[in-house]
């Protein structure tokens, strides 16, 4: 699995076990990603932070 890093077009191949790509954004500024990368379990979104997870190459 390949996931985008914070600044596309840079990306990395995920290590074994981390089979989701994720993008973290602030709810106040949903178009500006704060963090991107590989993750094993999708974190829960909160009142301030939203997580978007997916499992195909560079989908974040």
UniProtKB/Swiss-Prot annotation:
Keywords: Cardiotoxin, Cytolysis, Disulfide bond, Hemolysis, Membrane, Secreted, Target cell membrane, Target membrane, Toxin. One of its GO terms (biological process) is killing of cells of another organism. It comes from the Eukaryota. InterPro entries: Cytotoxin_Cobra, Snake_3FTx, Snake_toxin-like_sf, Snake_toxin_con_site, Toxin_cobra-type. The keyword Signal does not apply. The keyword Ion transport does not apply. Expressed by the venom gland. Gene3D superfamilies: CD59. It is found in: Secreted; Target cell membrane. GO terms for molecular function: toxin activity. Monomer in solution; Homodimer and oligomer in the presence of negatively charged lipids forming a pore with a size ranging between 20 and 30 angstroms. Positive charges of Lys residues are necessary for cytolytic activity of this toxin, but not for its binding ability. Basic protein that binds to cell membrane and depolarizes cardiomyocytes. This cytotoxin also possesses lytic activity on many other cells, including red blood cells. Interaction with sulfatides in the cell membrane induces pore formation and cell internalization and is responsible for cytotoxicity in cardiomyocytes. It targets the mitochondrial membrane and induces mitochondrial swelling and fragmentation. Inhibits protein kinases C. It binds to the integrin alpha-V/beta-3 with a moderate affinity. Belongs to the three-finger toxin family. Short-chain subfamily. Type IA cytotoxin sub-subfamily. This is Cytotoxin 1.
């Amino acid at each position: 699995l390949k996931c985008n890093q914070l600044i596309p077009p840079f990306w990395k191949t995920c290590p074994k076990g981390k089979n989701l790509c994720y993008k973290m954004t602030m709810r106040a500024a949903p178009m500006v990603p704060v963090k991107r990368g590989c993750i094993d379990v999708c974190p829960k979104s909160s009142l301030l932070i939203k997580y978007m997870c997916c499992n195909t190459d560079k989908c974040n």
